[in-house]
Amino acid sequence: MITRRDFLKVTAAGGALASLGSVTEAKAAMKSAVPDEGFCHEGARKIPVIAEVDLVVAGGSSRAIAAAVAAAKTGSRVYLVGYMPYLGEDICGSHLYERKEGEKLQTALARKLFPGKNFPTPLHIKKTLEDELIDNNVQFLYSSYVTNVLTDPSGKPAGVVIANRSGRQAIRCKTIIDATHNASVAGLLGAERKPFIAGSQEFCYTVVGNTPKEAPEIIQAEELSQPIKVGEKSYPVTRYTFHLPLKDDSYASLAEVEQIIRNRTWDIDQVDSSDLLWYIPKQTINSEKAYNGNPVSWRKLPMQAFKSKNIANLWVLGPCAEIPRELAAKVMRPVPALFIGEMMGETVARQIKDIPVPAQATVRQLKVNASNYGQTGELLSPLRPSLQKGFVASPAGALPVLGSYDVVVMGGGTAGASAGISAAKQGANTLVLEYLHGLGGLSTLGMIGVYWDGFRGGYTAHIDKSVLAMAPKDHPRQPKGEGRFPADWKMEWHRKELLQAGGKLWFGVMGCGALIEGSQVKGVVVATPFGRGVILSKILIDSTGSADIAIAAGAAFDYTGKKTIAVQGAGTGKWAPGDYYNNNDWLFVDDTDILDVSRAFVQAKTKLQGQYDLVKIPQTRERRRVIGDYIISVYDVINHRRYPDTISYHKSSFDTHGMIIDPLFILNPPEKRHKIYDADVPLRCLLPKGLEGILTTGLGASAHRDAMPVIRMQPCLQNQGYAVGYLSALCVKENKSPRKIDIKKVQRHLVKIGNLPERVLTDKEFKGFSNSEMKKAIASVTDNYK
């Protein structure tokens, strides 16, 4: 976007040069002065430093852990940053549990991971890798993306900046091992690499339980030698090899390929599949010395092929190393890569032993004449007072604009999936962004696949009927009883509904900030496995479940802490193929605190030892709640308060899992354990106070913590998501903000489909009680204040 001031500067400079007869120079000057709309300006800021170490390892693959542990054993201080909610993203994420013929277990870690002839379970892999880090004093975080790098005054690596649900933090170091699949950290440092060439790319994808499929893009469908056995059940495992075009080196292109592959392979018998595509990128870095041979042993593989040519102290432990692509396909499989990782960890540790951590470091920023779309807001608070190591400067720079959409939904969970589908069905150009590799959130990947309470009419009734209709009534996986849904069926139904409606879907993306101009939210800042960027929106739906983006934009919020330590119980349950309900309540966790989340996953693996696997998302019932234009109270629920702008209808008991704090409950605790209350939620509770162009849904809505249990049931939030998606699309069509939209028009549609009772069309605003009415009420109180 070019401003009036920019326009005047450009035309003045170009005119001056043209008047001197230099038309070529005039064109060049104008081109360099015109802001690039493909980039968004970002202002200067300071990033909190949480650690200072010798080595940072970026990536959570088995080879990354091997390198980190090997370096730690030499005495190096190591910090590992993994972007998935588990370690072993190559084995567990891409489903590479088998050993190929000739793959020898040459390291102690390899022998621990693959102890016998049978395929190891995901939980065994994850816990073994985690224990290796803990036992060797390697610090690590889950669910964190490397988004920027630190450099010293000479341009050498001096650390990384990471993004997670706690915000962004910096880690200072001497050197970096980039163990990401696409050498994304090397890219952030400006490491030279071969040019990208568009064309056909080979991708591998593994499914469990399905019958083999045929499609023009499938060049091989191999049934692996061992099925997956859980109890008395046995499931075949099929690995597909696809040839598909990769249009460019953007994350959007990879996301598109992923959805095509999922389209071609899914059926109703599927009980599991890869989170991540396995492939060997055609691009490599330019290394100190390319290797073109075929070593007789992995030990003969020269480390120079893994070291950047133009960036000192940068190593690439991944398939983008400068080795032949056929060789990369062999050595990046888990067993050989464990050996390579161990070699690299030892080599790097020796080379940096006597090098000091750079005394000065700043965030490396893109040098682009970026457009001024607005300001980027984010959380920049230290994780803990005890971890505060100062700050590093992040000068003004630029973020790539990854796309522009009518409606962007950040979070594809219980409400977010419905919101995206609804907006797309109304014709809005819609993008849904989800951190995990499936839709539905806690209702699917969180293994809470059975309804408790909730209003099951309206759009939810459509979901329920449609999901169960995906298979014949006599299918062995059809659940017995109402309100139960196989997790993978529901995930797939959401996914296909969104895509068939014309929506776009990117998995593996985390929201880490907001783009704002004044009070207007204009987009979301995201972290992807390829780096950080901005996605522009006309309407942004914050379905993170904890108002992450609204808070980053400056919205006030409420949560446990200063006022009270009360928090509802949570869990981190087991999972095995075919499961859809493993609810539990055994821990307390703040799922917006990355240290607490990482701790919960560590603790869960010990508790669940011997199980097949565990969930990929903490099963939390209480999160940050935005302060909206209105805050629903316990009194509103008990008194059945009505509103003229009701957007969703809810039915539940006070299903609290922990201490209640509202003073009303001291006088008069909730009645019977399972008394059902009906509650309306007005649109005002989904509108962050002081912000335009954004709505929050679900557990992030504006409500008192003791009122939230009545309005957080899955059936109700599916309906709420649909309503918000419909409203957002209408805002785009009519070019109005959510506060200016004709709410009665929205309500009429929601009444028609059964989301809302017809009375909402005539409900009036409650004006409250006068002082005289309150005095009369107090005087008439009897029967223990009831």
Model-identified regions with their sequence ranges:
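Secretory targeting signals
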Residues: 1-2
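N-terminal export signals
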Residues: 6-28
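C-terminal segment of N-terminal export signals and the immediately downstream linker at the start
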Residues: 22-54, 60, 364
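Conserved N-terminal/central alpha/beta ligand/cofactor-binding core
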Residues: 44, 70, 76-77, 81-155, ...
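Flavin (FAD/FMN)-binding glycine-rich loop and adjacent Rossmann-like elements that form
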Residues: 46-47, 90, 102-103, 119, ...
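Beta1/beta-strand and adjacent pyrophosphate-binding region of the FAD-binding site
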Residues: 50-61, 402-413
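Loop/turn elements at helix/coil->beta-strand transitions in domains of secreted/extracellular proteins
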Residues: 53, 74-77, 136-138, 312, ...
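N-terminal Rossmann-fold NAD(P) dinucleotide-binding loop
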Residues: 64, 416
